[in-house]
């Protein structure tokens, strides 16, 4: 697990480096599917003092199997998403400014241009609000459930992120670094959408044929963007 702990540590350290977190906000995890174990950031530990050895290993029920700290308070959300979506290898949660602003507004981040379409096939959805019962009960587990409810049967890697109403963004990917990459992009396109709609409140979504082209040339079966 040392290699995965190092990867998760590095991915967590990328959050302040890319300006996605303040203080101890945010967390990144990754899963070892063969062993059924998840590595995640410890709860409330400052990034400046954090080490790879501090990463916490939990099983799929959330039981700590390695580590001296409590795991992130959002662990149950991560585990619920891993259980539902076998294609996920890494998950990140932040309170990055612009993506969180869309979450607080209760609005999906609209697909307005090709930067968005290069990574997200359509709008980045916003969940419904959790009920008082859901919040007072198993809050973090229910956060995962409302994300799954919103995504439905969609392929999560085609829309590798979501904003949870009145909370903030979650993003995911093939591994921890890919998840952070998608979280960085989500914050950037959230900012772009806010600026664009401020300039032109009547701005329409990106044309579907242009969105399809940009997404498929990077992620489709005949993708040709980048190097083999």
UniProtKB/Swiss-Prot annotation:
Question: Which pathway does the record list?
Answer: Cofactor degradation; L-ascorbate degradation; D-xylulose 5-phosphate from L-ascorbate: step 4/4
User: What does the induction field say?
Assistant: Induced by L-ascorbate. Repressed by UlaR.
Keyword annotations for this protein, in alphabetical order, are: Carbohydrate metabolism, Isomerase, Metal-binding, Zinc
* A GO biological process held by the record: L-ascorbic acid catabolic process
Q: Which GO terms describe its molecular function?
A: aldehyde-lyase activity; L-ribulose-phosphate 4-epimerase activity; zinc ion binding
Q: Which residues bind substrate?
A: 26-27, 43-44, 72-73
Q: Which reaction does it catalyse?
A: L-ribulose 5-phosphate = D-xylulose 5-phosphate
**Enzyme Commission code(s) on record:** 5.1.3.4
Q: Catalytic site residues?
A: 118, 225
Q: Where are the transmembrane segments?
A: none
Q: Which cofactor does it need?
A: Zn(2+)
Q: Which InterPro entries match?
A: Aldolase_class_II_sugar_metab, Aldolase_II/adducin_N, Aldolase_II/adducin_N_sf, UlaF
Q: Read off the Pfam families from this record.
A: Aldolase_II
* Any one cellular-component term (Gene Ontology): cytosol
What's the record's note on cofactor binding?
Binds 1 zinc ion per subunit.
* Binding-site positions, Zn(2+): 74, 93, 95, 167
Which family does the record assign? Belongs to the aldolase class II family. AraD/FucA subfamily.
According to its UniProt entry, the function of this protein is described as: Catalyzes the isomerization of L-ribulose 5-phosphate to D-xylulose 5-phosphate. Is involved in the anaerobic L-ascorbate utilization.
The name this protein goes by in its record = L-ribulose-5-phosphate 4-epimerase UlaF
Species source reads Escherichia coli O7:K1 (strain IAI39 / ExPEC)
Q: Which gene encodes it?
A: ulaF
